[in-house]
Design a protein with these regions (language model features):
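C-terminal long alpha-helix characteristic of the crotonase
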Residues: 95-100, 142, 151-198, 204, ...
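Terminal low-complexity tails and localization/encapsulation signals of metabolic enzymes
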Residues: 217-230
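Conserved CoA-thioester-binding segment of acyl-CoA-metabolizing enzymes
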Residues: 1-27, 49, 63, 151
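A short acidic, glycine-rich active-site loop
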Residues: 45-56
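CoA-thioester-processing core
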Residues: 61, 65-67, 75, 81-135, ...
Length: 230
C-alpha cells in the first residue's frame, strides 16, 4: 500500500545518511509471501487518479531502493508477485527459497508492471525471457530463476534470511566508498537513465481502456476476463 511504499522510501533515505550502514536485507513476514504486490481493489475503486498515485509510489520507492548506496539483498521467502517481484528486482542480490514463486502477472488483469519490471527484468534475464515472463504471465520457480539469472542463489525453505544476512555481513569487509562507486558505475552502464519513469505514463493510460476495467473486475469476481481489445 501507499504507506508501505512511502515507508520504504523514507527508510532508504535514512540509511543513506547513516555512515554505519552499508547493507540492507528485505524479506517478507510469515512463510508464504515475500510480497503479493499491489491490492487490485485500490485500482478498481479509485480509478485513474488512484492508478497514477499508486504507480508513482511504486516507481519512487523502488528507484530509491535501487539507488541505495550500499548493498541491498532480497531474501525471497515465498510468492513474489507483481510489485513484490519488482521490489526484489530493485535489490542488488536476490536469494530465493525452494518454495518461492516469481511472476509479473499484470497483463492478466489488463495492467502492466509499474515498478520497473519491464525495464529492469530484461537486463537480468535478457529480452527473450523478460517477454516470456511478462507477456505470458508464466510463474517462475527458483531452479529456472537461477538458470536464467533472475536470482543469484537458491536455498532450502526457511534459509533465505540467514543466507542474505551472511551475504550482508561480508559487505563489512568491503570499502563503503568503493561499494557506492561501483554501484554507480554499474548503473551508468544501463541504456536508460530513468527506467522507473518509463512505465508511468503507459500504466496510467491503461485506465482509459475497457480491458483494464474488465481485467480487474474479472479478477475480483474470480472469473475469466472477456477481452475486447478496447
Amino acid at each position: 500500500d501507499l504507506e508501505s511504499l512511502s515507508g520504504l522510501e523514507e527508510i532508504i533515505e535514512l540509511l543513506n545518511k547513516d555512515d554505519e550502514v552499508f547493507s540492507l536485507v528485505i524479506t517478507g513476514q510469515g512463510e508464504k509471501f515475500f510480497s503479493a504486490g499491489a491490492d487490485l481493489k485500490v485500482f478498481h475503486e479509485g480509478g485513474k487518479d488512484a492508478a497514477k498515485e499508486m504507480s508513482t509510489a511504486f516507481s519512487q520507492a523502488f528507484e530509491a531502493l535501487s539507488k541505495f548506496r550500499g548493498v541491498s539483498i532480497a531474501a525471497i521467502n515465498g510468492f513474489a508477485m507483481g510489485g513484490g517481484l519488482e521490489c526484489a528486482l530493485a535489490c542488488d542480490i536476490r536469494v530465493a527459497e525452494e518454495k518461492a514463486v516469481l511472476a509479473l502477472p499484470e497483463p492478466k488483469v489488463g495492467l502492466l508492471p509499474c515498478g520497473g519490471g519491464t525495464q529492469v527484468l530484461p537486463r537480468l534475464v535478457g529480452e527473450g525471457w523478460a517477454k516470456r515472463i511478462i507477456l505470458t504471465g508464466e510463474q517462475i520457480k527458483p531452479d529456472q530463476a537461477l538458470k536464467i539469472g533472475l536470482i543469484e542463489e537458491k536455498v532450502e525453505d526457511g534459509k533465505s534470511l540467514d543466507t542474505a544476512m551472511s551475504i550482508a555481513s561480508s559487505v563489512a569487509n568491503q570499502s563503503p566508498s568503493s561499494i557506492s562507486q561501483c554501484k554507480d558505475l554499474i548503473h551508468k552502464a544501463r541504456l536508460s537513465n530513468e527506467p522507473y519513469k518509463e512505465e508511468l505514463e503507459p500504466f496510467v493510460k491503461l485506465f482509459d481502456t475497457k480491458d483494464q476495467k474488465e481485467g480487474v473486475e474479472a479478477f475480483l469476481d474470480k472469473r475469466k476476463p472477456n477481452w475486447q481489445n478496447a
